Regions:
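N-terminal membrane-insertion helices
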Residues: 143-154, 288, 292-296
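Structural beta-alpha unit
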Residues: 4-5, 9-28, 51-55, 59-71, ...
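Charged helix-capping and loop-helix junction motifs
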Residues: 210-214, 289-293, 347-352
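Short secondary-structure boundary segments
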Residues: 33-34, 200, 276, 336-338, ...
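A short acidic, glycine-rich active-site loop
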Residues: 131-148
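Active-site phosphate/pyrophosphate- and oxyanion-stabilizing loops and adjacent acidic/basic residues
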Residues: 216, 259-262, 297, 322, ...
């Protein structure tokens, strides 16, 4: 039986509110050091929970706005969002999303956005569309073409489901007008998907034409869990990782991110290598090593399907990352991601960006 630990110390009213919030998510909560008959006699209340529920409790506390309306009937359950452009790399992403949906008894939502030709100054779908019918006719024609391509894309998925090539899940379709990255972010904010799965091209093609910038923009929003699926890989390889590289910030957000990883891919026996992110001077070298060691011990005790180890070096640049990849052969990278402002991104692009544009390894980016 898991021992109880103190999550927080609050006033009586706040402790009751937190207990209600946690119990609604299935967490057992005890209140200690308070006179429950007359709460005015107590200045503080310890909110205690089972130790194994700590990651979930931290996630709930850090994201109260996402859990407060959990009883809403309009809230979608276990939806996986797949932005598509009808290319092969977006089809690979859709196949991977079907497997995620099957594992978690959910559905997938295909999302395509098209640009108004009068605003974009170009034709996005095909060069054969005629805009001589006027602005209204052109928009109707463009939307009709978008829906036709979406229907064909969904039918291809259904055909492969029937043949047993990919799992059978419910497929929803959404077509909207707008800039792709803005449409994805707005849809995700409104529908809170469990995961966003995005296809990316090979590293060579991304470096050549900067394809993948839409994915980078979605990551910059920083509030969604995103799985990137590189073009050369198949779905099974992406969803059955054997060796995972986890970038650690050496704070409690690591526990949140590891718990998200385990909930998504915890049915596979995998090795997880914990590596230190480039950090500020708030940690000495010895303190950082102790913090990483404590994190490794905690994870080994609470996530039994995984075997945890620490990287022998701290990853500070792309060359160090490449050497580590050559040594271990990681097949999934997990990156806790903080939201960054535009200026800092321009001056010092984040590690997530560099991995997207410089490697062909699937990456799970988790907001913290």
């Amino acid at each position: 039986m898991s021992r109880f630990i103190t999550l927080a110390i609050h006033t009586y009213e706040k402790a009751l509110s937190l207990r209600t919030l946690l119990e609604n998510e299935g967490i057992n909560v005890e209140l200690h050091n308070v006179n429950l008959e007359d709460p005015r006699l107590s200045s503080g209340v310890r909110v205690r929970i089972p130790e194994h529920d700590l990651p979930l409790a931290l996630r709930i506390v850090e994201n109260r706005e996402l859990f407060a309306d959990n009883g809403s009937p309009d809230r979608p359950a276990h939806t996986v969002l797949v932005p598509v452009d009808f290319s092969e790399h977006s089809y690979n992403a859709a196949c991977a999303a079907c497997e995620v949906g099957r594992r978690h008894n959910g559905s997938i939502t295909l999302l395509y956005s098209y640009l108004d030709p009068y605003l974009a100054g170009k034709v996005q779908l095909t060069d054969t569309l005629s805009y001589e019918t006027g602005e209204r006719g052109a928009r109707q024609q463009l939307e009709g073409e978008a829906r036709r391509l979406m229907d064909n894309f969904a039918e291809r998925l259904r055909s492969h489901m029937k043949r047993g090539h990919i799992p059978i899940v419910k497929v929803n379709r959404e077509v909207a007008e707008g800039v792709p990255e803005d449409t994805i972010v707005d849809f995700a904010k409104a529908n809170t998907p469990r995961l966003i799965v995005m296809g990316t091209r090979s590293a060579e093609r991304k470096q050549a034409d900067m394809i993948g910038s839409v994915t980078a923009e979605v990551l910059d929003e920083g509030r969604f869990t995103v799985l990137t699926v590189p073009e050369p890989l198949d779905c099974e390889a992406v969803l059955s990782p054997r060796h995972i590289l986890f970038f650690s910030n050496l704070d409690q957000n690591d526990i949140l991110a590891i718990d998200t990883l385990y909930r998504l891919f915890g049915d596979n026996e995998s090795t997880v290598t914990l590596a230190q992110m480039p950090r500020k001077n708030r940690f000495s070298e010895s303190a950082a090593e102790k913090a990483l060691s404590r994190l490794t011990e905690y994870c080994a005790e609470n996530y039994k399907q995984y075997r945890f180890e620490t990287a022998p070096v701290r990853i500070t640049d792309d060359d160090e990352f490449s050497r580590l990849q050559d040594r271990y052969g990681f097949d999934l990278i997990v990156l806790p991601n903080r939201r960054r402002n535009a200026l800092s991104r321009l001056i010092n692009p984040g590690l997530a960006h560099r991995i997207i544009f410089g490697s062909d390894i699937p990456m799970l980016v988790i907001p913290v």
